[in-house]
Amino acid sequence: EYEAFRNLDWLDAGIDHRTRYELRNDDIRRNQVLTDHQFLLRTRAYIGIRNILDPFRMAVEFQDSRGYNSHFPKDNRDWNPFELIQTYGELYFKDALGKDDLGNSRPLRIRGGRMSWEAVDRRLLGNNQWRNTTNNFEGFRVTFGQESNDWELDAWGMQPVIRNINEFDGRSKDQWFYGAVGHWRKWSDVMTIQPYFMG
């Protein structure tokens, strides 16, 4: 731990860059049979503020996704430059639901804005780490509890964000995505029961 950063526990910050070369030979996603030698670049930067303004918290995440040296036109699987993939405000109440049997605080979190997250172990809702661009949504999300608790409930009402290659991404105003995922961990240290609804 660095002395200069000791009092910055309220600030989360990170930067990430990935460069990937792909040899796509007879790609099944294309209607032409040829070999493509593509370079995919993805840069992310994240800033989050917590604790210092509690119960208010916020986060902003930027992503720049580009692909070069392809025989095919740009598409939104590989190309989405200068985009905000997350920008949300959060109300965080650490002990709103008391403590669980393990002594952990059971918080209540209410978020609003643009978000990207994963649910049900990425099987039904994932931000697709392999693809060069990211799935995200705009709307509201409420979480009762946290991962260290013996139970947790995550519920949301969102509109999908449509990735636009040439303009700032916007939400699909005609489409809503609702859901809830429960996490029941009381009976076992190695097993979690996850009932869910999505529609």
Residue ranges and their predicted role:
Residues 9, 35-43, 80-85, 134-138, ...:
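Residues that define the transmembrane beta-barrel architecture of outer-membrane proteins
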Residues 19-25, 51-55, 62-68, 114-118, ...:
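Transmembrane beta-strands of outer-membrane beta-barrel pores
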Residues 77-84, 91, 104, 119-122, ...:
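Outer-membrane pore/translocation modules
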